[in-house]
């Protein structure tokens, strides 16, 4: 995660982290959002510092409250619809259970943002979530996020 992040990018990262945590079912979205906004969680990320796997904690720019809260509120309000859109976009040989939790949180945040902020250009949303995905994965997941969010965005625009 060595790329310089903006407050809006940090908001998206925080939303992904919050939805990942929400996926464990131990806290409400409101509880998790408060913890992020208070800086109790999500203020740092682990970054590899060399080719040997050495890691250190690196501070993250604070999230922009409007974007972060908007993504989480959109997910809370539309969770069933968002998860159905993600499920419908999966390849025929994939099931929802096969989608790893981090990847699912990235997709959930991306779709929630597309719903909550239709004025944000789709290309910006796609680039941001593809960039986020590349912080966690190096393989096909990057193409999966790009393709699925692109297809969902097209479906939302035509609805």
Residue spans for each PLM region:
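N-terminal interaction/assembly modules
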Residues: 1-159
């Amino acid at each position: 995660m060595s790329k310089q992040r903006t407050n809006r990018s940090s908001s998206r990262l925080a939303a992904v982290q919050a939805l990942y945590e929400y996926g464990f079912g131990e806290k409400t979205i409101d509880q998790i959002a408060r913890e992020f906004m208070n800086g109790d969680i999500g203020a740092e990320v682990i970054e590899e510092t060399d080719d040997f796997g050495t890691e250190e904690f690196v501070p993250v720019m604070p999230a922009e409250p409007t974007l972060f809260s908007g993504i989480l509120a959109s997910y809370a309000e539309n969770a069933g619809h968002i998860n159905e859109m993600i499920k419908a976009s999966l390849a025929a040989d994939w099931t929802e259970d096969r989608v790893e939790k981090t990847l699912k949180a990235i997709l959930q945040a991306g779709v929630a943002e597309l719903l909550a902020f239709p004025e944000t250009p789709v290309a910006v949303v796609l680039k941001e979530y593809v960039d986020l995905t590349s912080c966690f994965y190096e393989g096909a997941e990057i193409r999966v996020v790009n393709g699925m969010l692109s297809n969902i965005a097209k479906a939302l625009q035509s609805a």
